[in-house]
Curated annotation (Swiss-Prot):
Annotated compartments: Secreted
Job description of the protein: These peptides may have low toxicity to eukaryotic cells and low antimicrobial activities against bacterial and fungi. It is unknown whether these CART-related peptides affect feeding, as mammalian CART peptides do.
Originating organism: Thalassophryne nattereri (Copper Joe toadfish)
S-S bonds: C69-C87, C75-C95, C89-C102
Keyword Phosphoprotein among record annotations: no
Protein name, UniProt field: Niq CART3
PANTHER family named in the record: COCAINE AND AMPHETAMINE REGULATED TRANSCRIPT PROTEIN, COCAINE- AND AMPHETAMINE-REGULATED TRANSCRIPT 2-RELATED
UniProt keyword list: Antibiotic, Antimicrobial, Disulfide bond, Fungicide, Secreted, Signal, Toxin
């Protein structure tokens, strides 16, 4: 009989301790919510910007149009022996193959 009472008391004390830590955990989650939501919103914003840039590049590829760039702006990319055109230089300027800029 005493063993049952001791066992019940031990079980109740363990359950009370577990309930307290869960409540504290919930309180910490509520306090950390603004920080976590701001971080998630920042990551989502970066993803949306990246998707918009990719969509713009897809439109340029589809219609075969290359955007125009200003003088002094990089106009080409070199990867090994190959060169790729990033943008079209304005009239009167040309893309320098050494500097990869509109001059």
């Amino acid at each position: 009989m005493w063993a049952r009472a001791v066992l019940c008391a031990a079980l109740l004390s363990v359950m009370c301790l577990a309930g307290c830590t869960e409540a504290e955990r919930d309180e910490r989650d509520v306090q950390d919510y603004p920080y976590k939501s701001n971080r998630m919103l920042g990551a989502l914003h970066e993803d949306v910007e990246q998707l918009e840039m990719n969509r713009m590049n897809a439109l340029e590829k589809r219609y075969g149009q290359i955007r125009s760039c200003d003088v002094g702006e990089p106009c080409a990319i070199r990867k090994g022996s190959r060169m790729g055109k990033k943008c079209e230089c304005p009239q009167g300027a040309s893309c320098n193959r050494l500097l990869l800029k509109c001059l």
